[in-house]
Amino acid sequence: VNQTPKPAGDAAPTAPARNVAALNAVDFSIDGKTIFRGLDIAIRRGEVTAIMGPSGTGKTTLLRLITGQLRADSGRVVVEGRDVAGLGRRELYAMRRRIGMLFQNGALLTDLDVFENVAFPLREHARLPERLLRNIVLSKLHAVGLRGAAQLRPQQLSGGMSRRVALARAIVMDPQLLLYDEPFAGLDPISMGVVLRLIRSLNDALGISSVVVTHDVREISQIADSSYILSGGQVVASGTPAELREHPSPVVHQFMDGLADGPVTFHYPAPDYPAQLLDRSEGT
């Protein structure tokens, strides 16, 4: 995959930090509701990190904390060695340009064709000759297998193709960190397999780091280097997919195996069933 040119510096390169991003003792709440309490997560450089957990545990909120769209109540969110809370507006925008984002719905611009959807970030943020821009866009589309679809409109694409176009757009600025929000949602098995392979292959080919928020345990376990399971505002387990499958926690066991009942119960709390049936004071 071709990368956009970057100016060469005179200084000798220094060894990059082990973590491209980290959340340290993060507390966060919305409207008085606690989302995270003392959250600790490390996104290691060059790896695919999975963020999993039941619905409503704040997985997408975590991505917004990393990008600075939300600010933690306490603790630190660090990206590329810098505390996000301490960045000014210009520095924050510069940081976001080094982060790619694949949204669950793809978020393609319906009035632009595939080529212009992928070209959009370059036209907004880079002053490139048209020929160079064209070559970069085509190379990214080629990387996701859709160079031949450059002139199609979003309405002509399948769900899987739309997701791949959005992925090409997410990598067009050569990000150092790529964030995926439920990338497999709504995809058929073939499309899911294609996106799964692309997440791993692009991560390795581009030398980037990836964070994948997902419920799809079986699929992400095939490619993730490390995984975190969130529940109750905290990390309840972390490790490789193999380590999580052997984890002793009942919550982790229920989630990894997709069990209908367990710590997360099947029945919503209710009075004793026979007693409720006999209670004439309750309305229907």
Regions found by a protein language model. Give the residues of each.
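Conserved catalytic motifs of ABC-family nucleotide-binding domains
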Residues: 174
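ABC ATPase nucleotide-binding domains
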Residues: 257-284
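Catalytic Walker B motif of ABC-type/P-loop ATPase nucleotide-binding domains
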Residues: 178-181
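Conserved ABC ATPase signature
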Residues: 153-157, 161
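Conserved ABC ATPase "signature" region
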Residues: 82-83, 130-148
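Helix-to-loop junction immediately C-terminal to a conserved catalytic motif
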Residues: 67
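The feature captures the beta-strand-to-loop junction immediately N-terminal to the Walker
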Residues: 52-54
